[in-house]
């Protein structure tokens, strides 16, 4: 089963080192929620996820369900799954409100909940929520530090760089303090994840990019174990050209958001995306899509038969990922998402 077994090790010492770091932690297989359909209909889906071998579910928060409600339902419905947010923006909840939500989830699912915090993007934070997208590194760092204090039951009175808290103490003290993960793209945030949190959450990268990212986290951790949770976009379909053409829309939408554009440049993919960026900035969306190569699609989107997809996901795990949090993309309209979910677990 993919969540507990992996393909052969890396090709060079660097990747072997990353695989060695990952091997100290259980390899886990997760699915992104919410699942298709209304939230009240997900109970049987969640049971089936656990039945076929998934260990985790990870929520997202953008324009659909909030990041906590699907997990709260899962906490009551399916006790076999670990529950995580990937991610909650550090900007869109005030500190005390954030601490209450985190503590409540940890109380509802003792020992099974992980909180993932990140900067999100200027689109979600500023354009959709009306909050200035300023000092993202400091904002995430401050929220992580505040949550660590608050979740330990301490009375927090402190001037952080990006907010202040005066006399707050949580009224809910979870039996188990939840791990805190940091969503990270480039070096500064990756170092924060390694130094001050329990792990990093990464996305929009290929399997071959993982060692570059994971090494920074582990170096910053100074020898302590850190999880690397990767959201991996997957479409198990062998209708290759249909998937590739549809994937280009998703890639263009994300890679023109400044934080993701800079991430791809840092990974070394800038030259491959220059044509797309130039066409997009010039207002020619059709040319921008055409400029995205099949190689870029194949690096960022896992697709092919279920066996091929499982092999590609295994490469992420071999290269340093500890939890593969799959996100099913219905890029092929013929895709049966429930069957795809089963097939990706090897069921």
Regions inferred by a protein language model and the residue ranges of each:
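Active-site-adjacent structural elements that line small-molecule/cofactor binding pockets in enzymes
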Residues: 2-347
């Amino acid at each position: 089963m993919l969540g507990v077994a992996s393909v052969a090790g890396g090709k060079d010492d660097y990747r072997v080192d990353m695989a060695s770091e990952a091997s100290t932690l259980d390899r886990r297989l997760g699915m992104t929620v919410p699942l298709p359909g209304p939230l009240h209909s997900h109970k049987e889906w969640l049971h089936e996820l656990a039945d076929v071998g998934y260990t985790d579910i990870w929520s997202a928060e953008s324009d659909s369900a909030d990041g906590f409600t699907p997990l709260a339902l899962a906490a009551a419905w399916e006790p076999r799954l670990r529950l995580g947010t990937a991610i909650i923006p550090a900007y869109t909840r005030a500190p005390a409100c954030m601490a209450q939500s985190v503590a409540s989830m940890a109380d509802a699912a003792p020992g099974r909940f992980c909180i993932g915090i990140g900067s999100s993007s200027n689109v979600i934070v500023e354009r959709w929520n009306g909050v200035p997208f300023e000092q993202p590194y400091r904002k995430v760092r401050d929220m992580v530090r505040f949550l660590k204090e608050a979740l330990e039951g301490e009375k927090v009175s402190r001037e952080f760089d990006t907010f202040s808290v005066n006399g707050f103490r949580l009224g809910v003290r979870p039996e188990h303090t939840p791990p805190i993960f940091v969503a990270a793209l480039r070096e500064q945030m990756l170092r924060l994840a390694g130094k001050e949190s329990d792990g990093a959450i990464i996305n929009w990268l290929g399997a071959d990019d993982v060692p570059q990212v994971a090494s920074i986290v582990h170096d910053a951790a100074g020898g302590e174990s850190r999880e690397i949770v990767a959201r991996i976009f997957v479409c198990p379909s062998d209708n290759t050209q249909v998937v590739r053409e549809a994937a280009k829309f998703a890639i263009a939408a994300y890679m023109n958001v400044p934080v993701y554009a800079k991430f791809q440049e840092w990974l070394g993919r800038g030259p491959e995306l220059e044509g797309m960026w130039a066409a997009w900035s010039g207002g020619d969306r059709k040319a921008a899509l055409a400029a995205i190569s099949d190689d870029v699609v194949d690096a960022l989107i896992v697709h092919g038969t279920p066996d091929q997809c499982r092999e590609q996901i295994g490469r992420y795990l071999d290269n340093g990922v500890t939890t593969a949090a799959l996100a099913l993309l219905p890029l092929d309209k013929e895709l049966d998402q429930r069957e795809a979910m089963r097939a990706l677990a090897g069921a």
